[in-house]
Amino acid sequence: MKKISITLVAFLLLTSCKKEDVQLPKADISVMTDITDHSPIYMFYENDSVVDVNKNNSISTTNWVFNIDKRLPLQVVIPEIMQLQYKKANSSHKKEGAINVFSYADSIGKNLAFLPFTDVQYKIDKDFSKFFIKKNAEAYMPYHNFTVNFNNENKITVDGNDIEREELVDFIKDFADFTNDGKTTILHLNFDKRLTFGEYIQNKILIWKLNSDKIQISSFEFIYDVNELPDCNCKL
């Protein structure tokens, strides 16, 4: 089986050519550092409204590594990801246990790293977790639910309340630690579709640091268009 476990410099050589290259997102921690039996998928930056997708090597029986340029906005990246998710899920040759990961650069360890997203289900444009939870209130009643929003300025709100990026992890952890009713806390993630893919990955990894036996991250992610959301007369 093929195995990825290479330095960042070597990877940049692999993802560059004469006319195109992929500028990977950066983060300060490695979620995963190697992956076996993989197919690479590339999304190149042309401009802020066009993505060039190279998916010729996407073999449905392998793990897929998504190498996506950090400059691309979510509004062009996510629909492409959704199409590829659908293709793999509905392939007659899919392999049980195969995963999908995003690649990024660990700026501290100076290595290539990976963030799994196999179970993520994207909801786009008109959906937001606050309304989704309300529609499915019975299913979410047994949990503590936090709507975490990353707006178009990449600022954070939790249930409509502003919170500094540096305070988010401690805020959620403190809540989970001091709650003794036995309920699991679920974080529901929302991203303005104008955010770049680089910002998206950094925010995802920030939230990943919270994953524990008391705190879960919802598999639903909301990539919203603020102009298409219902008017709730509230802060998102």
Give the ranges of each region predicted by the language model.
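Long, low-hydrophobicity, acidic/polar, solvent-exposed interaction domains
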Residues: 18-236
